[in-house]
Structure formats: C-alpha cells, structure tokens
Amino acid sequence: NKIILGLVVYQGIRTEELARLELQDLQLREGKINIQGSKKTEGRLLKLEAHQVYDLMDYVNVIRKQILEATGKQSNKVFTSIGTSLNFSNIMQNLVSSLRENNVKLRDIKQIRTSVITNWLKIHNLRKTQYMAGHRYVSSTEAYQINNIEELQEDIKKYHPIG
C-alpha cells in the first residue's frame, strides 16, 4: 500500500498504469520508473524519490517473491494481490478503504492524482507537468489550471475584506 500510494503521490501514476506496471519498467539502479503509454496517455520516464527506490527494492526482492510463493501465482506484474484474485482493482479498493479510515473526504485515487497535478502546475511549467502527468494533449493539463483558478476564486470570496 505504501509503495502504491507513493507512486500516485510522487509520480502521479494512474490506476490503469499501476496495473500494467511490469518488473522491466523499474529501473531501480537509476532511480527511475518507465510508465508505458496507452491510447489515452503518453509514455514517460519518471524519477523516483530515494526512499521509494529502497522500498521498491525490498518489495520486489523479498515481499513480492513471498507473495508469489504463498499464492502459487506467476506474474511479471509488479503488483499482485495476496489472495487468489489477479484483479488489480481489488488491491486499489482495499487501499482506498484503508485511506478513508484516516480521511473520510477521500473519494478515490483520481482525487489524489488531481491534487498532485494541480500542485505540479504551481511548481513546474505547463509542458513539464503535461509530460509528468502523461497527458497526450496539453488541453488535458490546462484543465487542471482551471481547477486551480476555481480554488483561488473561492479563497478570494472567503477572505477578501470587501467580498
């Protein structure tokens, strides 16, 4: 859960991309992760945080092997469930359920990704954010700027002395 959540928070990876992630997509020595493109998204090579590299190494070399041995599964996918199901959505449903225990307002993983991209737009330029988010079209990234503008308008209404 910690690794999956970290990939969503630090790299803005979508659920579908997490489900498709295979061992050869991890470049742990270089501290990078390769996200394969799809019909909707562009592929991209993203930097991992230092703690993510260690966590992923531990997961791939120890925990994942234990899960595969215990369940008798064979898979090239990075993430696999502990149960008999091969369905990745079960993993994500469990993650969202456990996150909701701490934050009741959380709707889904997309909500976290939206916050991540909105934050990236505050830090990076539009094109870099587009690349990092894997958006094929810049208009997809620009939609998050509108999201940010709406937040600013709400703040103005809330805190402006005349408003």
What are these regions (language model features)?
Residues 8, 19, 130:
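The alpha-helix within a helix-turn-helix
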